[in-house]
Amino acid sequence: MDEKLLKTIAESKYLVALTGAGVSAESGIPTFRGKDGLWNRYRPEELANPQAFAKDPEKVWKWYAWRMEKVFNAQPNKAHQAFAELERLGVLKCLITQNVDDLHERAGSRNVIHLHGSLRVVRCTSCNNSFEVESAPKIPPLPKCDKCGSLLRPGVVWFGEMLPPDVLDRAMREVERADVIIVAGTSAVVQPAASLPLIVKQRGGAIIEINPDETPLTPIADYSLRGKAGEVMDELVRHVRKALS
């Protein structure tokens, strides 16, 4: 393990992380853009946008119920556990994720920002009542709001929708404080998440990229570690723990 990399992490004043679908892929949750990605079997425009939901809510809900079932049955992997350990060590201050599962939290991470919402949450299309669910709904029937009776929808951000302003503001505040960012398992193409590491870089901070493949972020990353997030993060945290002891 690169000693300079370990020093960068151990001596960081405010380290944050940005994680994407590649982190949860090792838990059996399909990615969207990998070779075996979810979008290879389904057209995203058919399923993950407001128009598709308005046109055929049952079809969209069936797909999301299937995804929710996968998430609820999945277990955190070595990457999730490693990020939680970095937080326990006092090194990682905040974890920003593009993932809509709760595997970071179940691994023990506490300060997590979900940019794209969560499959654990459903919300009303009319009154905005939202609540957490413990299991995937059985479709049909379509789930209805217990307050106003309107149709419920998954609590995620769809294509064509804006990120909740408070969530994006919080993420921006975190990266503006950061002197190091670990970017793991993300294709670095989905905005505005892809711009977050650039803010750290522009402010003189370091980017540590972890990905099996090169991404648009690779040319400007200070460190690019090739491999699966679970394997790389597990080894990285073991070395960081030693460096801190």
From Swiss-Prot:
**Limits of the Deacetylase sirtuin-type domain:** 1-243
Its name, as the record gives it, is NAD-dependent protein deacylase 1
User: What does the UniProt record say this protein does?
Assistant: NAD-dependent lysine deacetylase and desuccinylase that specifically removes acetyl and succinyl groups on target proteins. Modulates the activities of several proteins which are inactive in their acylated form. Deacetylates the N-terminal lysine residue of Alba, the major archaeal chromatin protein and that, in turn, increases Alba's DNA binding affinity, thereby repressing transcription.
Indicate yes or no for the key word Zinc: yes
User: What does the UniProt keyword field contain?
Assistant: Cytoplasm, Metal-binding, NAD, Transcription, Transcription regulation, Transferase, Zinc
Q: Which reaction does it catalyse?
A: N(6)-acetyl-L-lysyl-[protein] + NAD(+) + H2O = 2''-O-acetyl-ADP-D-ribose + nicotinamide + L-lysyl-[protein]; N(6)-succinyl-L-lysyl-[protein] + NAD(+) + H2O = 2''-O-succinyl-ADP-D-ribose + nicotinamide + L-lysyl-[protein]
Relate the outcome reported for changing residue 33 to A: Reduces activity by 20%
